[in-house]
């Protein structure tokens, strides 16, 4: 039987500067990270529910493995930068990616009910993708809209697109 999750609830973490940290089996709920920086950190089997990374939070060379991000009011942006990060067998369900930038990131797992907005979206909604690899993702009800630039993005095979689309503007 796996060990229980450590719970962290209703917290605001500001201006953290962490390097080479391991977070294992943590359930974050109603948690906010603001103006924080993470270098070479790993989250293993963590859950993120109604959480946000925002106000300039940055991730460099971080690894998220078997993590789950879900629920309304779960935000990965506002603004947030992920650079050279790996999301391995992670699930993203009903979350917001507003004002988020992914640079040289790799994903595998599940996207369900996500919208990626391009530069023609209202201010603050754009997601920027630069050299991103979504090849290992199963996309369910996932849309790419408002002129998002996918020219450097590796997309999954057609059989991993379930009711998902790239909208032309």
Model-derived segments and spans:
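Tandem repeat scaffolds
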Residues: 1-167
């Amino acid at each position: 039987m796996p060990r229980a999750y450590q719970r962290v609830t209703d917290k605001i973490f500001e201006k953290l500067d962490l390097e080479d940290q391991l977070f294992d089996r943590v359930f974050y709920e109603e948690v906010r990270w603001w103006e924080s920086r993470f270098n070479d950190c790993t989250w293993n089997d963590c859950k993120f529910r109604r959480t946000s990374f925002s106000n300039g939070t940055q991730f460099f060379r971080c690894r998220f493995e078997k993590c789950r991000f879900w629920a309304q009011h779960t935000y990965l942006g506002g603004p947030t930068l992920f650079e050279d990060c790996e999301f391995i067998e992670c699930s993203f369900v009903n979350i917001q990616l507003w004002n988020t930038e992914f640079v040289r990131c790799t994903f595998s797992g599940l996207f369900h009910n996500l919208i990626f907005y391009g530069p023609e979206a209202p201010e603050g909604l754009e997601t920027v993708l630069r050299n991103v690899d979504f090849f290992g993702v199963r996309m369910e009800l996932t849309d790419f809209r408002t002129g998002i630039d996918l020219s450097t993005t590796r997309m999954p095979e057609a059989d991993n697109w379930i009711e998902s689309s790239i909208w032309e503007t």
